[in-house]
Design a protein with these regions (language model features):
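An interfacial alpha-helical scaffold signature
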Residues: 1-234
Length: 234
C-alpha cells in the first residue's frame, strides 16, 4: 500500500525475463511467456473485482520494493486521477471476422483452363476482378464503420486495435476489426443487447461479431513516466 493506492506485485528472477531469451522466441520460450501472460492477466482481473485498477505492461520489473514505492509516489497523481475517472467502467473487446470470401474479395490466380484465353480477354477479366475486389473492400469498411458507430453510441470511449493475424487467432475466419470499448457498469446490459442485435445482422452479411469481457482497462491507461533507475521493461 502507498496511501490510497496499492501496488500488486510478485517476485521474479531477472534471468527469467532476459531480453535475449525473449527475443529468441524458441517454442519453449513462447510457451513459457504465454503461461506468464495468462497468470499476469488473471492477477489483474482478480484485483479488478474489488477495485479500479491500472494495469502495467507485462514485463515491467522493479528492481526492489523501494524502487516500486518510489515509482508509485512519482506517478501518484496520474494514477489517482485515472482511477477516480475510471470508477466502475469496464473494458469490453469487440472483434469482427469475415465468415467467407464473398465480402473480402480475395482474388485467385488464373485457372488452368484460362490458359487458352487471349491476352486481352485475360486483362479484361482480371480488371473486372480487381474492380470487384475494391467494391468488396469498400463494402467491408462500410459495415465496420456501421458496427463501430452503433456500438459507440452507448460507450464513453473506444479504441481500435490492430487485428490479430490468423496464426494467433487459430480460426479459419480472418479478423478484420478489433476494438476496445469502455463503458459504465450500469450500461453494460443494454449495450450487450445492442451487440447481440448487431451480431445477428452482421451474420446475415457473412460477418461474425464476437464480444468478450469485462476486462481491466488495458487499452485506456495513461502512459506513466517511470525512470530506468526505478524499473526495467522488457
Amino acid at each position: 500500500p502507498a496511501g490510497p493506492i496499492a501496488a500488486v506485485a510478485s517476485r521474479v528472477g531477472l534471468d527469467q525475463f532476459d531480453v535475449e531469451k525473449l527475443e529468441g522466441k524458441t517454442a519453449e520460450d513462447i510457451r513459457w511467456l504465454n503461461q506468464v501472460a495468462v497468470r499476469h492477466n488473471d492477477i489483474i482481473r482478480q484485483a479488478a473485482r474489488s477495485s479500479p485498477v491500472l494495469p502495467l505492461r507485462l514485463g515491467t520489473i522493479f528492481r526492489s520494493k523501494d524502487s516500486l514505492l518510489a515509482a508509485v509516489a512519482h506517478c501518484r497523481k496520474a494514477v489517482a486521477d485515472f482511477l477516480q475517472a475510471l470508477g466502475d467502467r469496464q473494458e469490453w473487446a469487440v472483434k469482427l471476422y469475415v465468415q467467407n470470401d464473398r465480402i473480402t474479395g480475395r482474388l485467385d490466380g488464373p485457372h488452368l483452363n484460362d490458359a487458352v484465353m487471349s491476352g486481352a480477354e485475360y486483362l479484361r477479366r482480371r480488371g473486372a476482378e480487381l474492380r470487384r475486389c475494391r467494391e468488396m473492400q469498400t463494402e467491408l469498411q462500410r459495415e465496420i464503420t456501421a458496427v463501430e458507430d452503433r456500438l459507440a453510441a452507448r460507450t464513453d470511449r473506444r479504441r481500435r486495435v490492430r487485428p490479430l493475424p490468423d496464426a494467433l487467432t487459430g480460426r479459419r475466419e480472418k479478423m478484420v476489426y478489433n476494438a476496445a470499448y469502455l463503458l459504465p457498469a450500469a450500461d453494460v446490459e443494454p449495450w450487450l443487447a445492442t451487440v447481440h442485435e448487431t451480431r445477428d445482422t452482421m451474420q446475415k452479411k457473412g460477418l461474425l461479431l464476437e464480444v468478450t469481457g469485462p476486462w481491466p482497462p488495458y487499452h485506456f491507461c495513461p502512459e506513466l513516466t517511470i525512470s530506468a533507475s526505478e524499473s526495467t521493461s522488457k
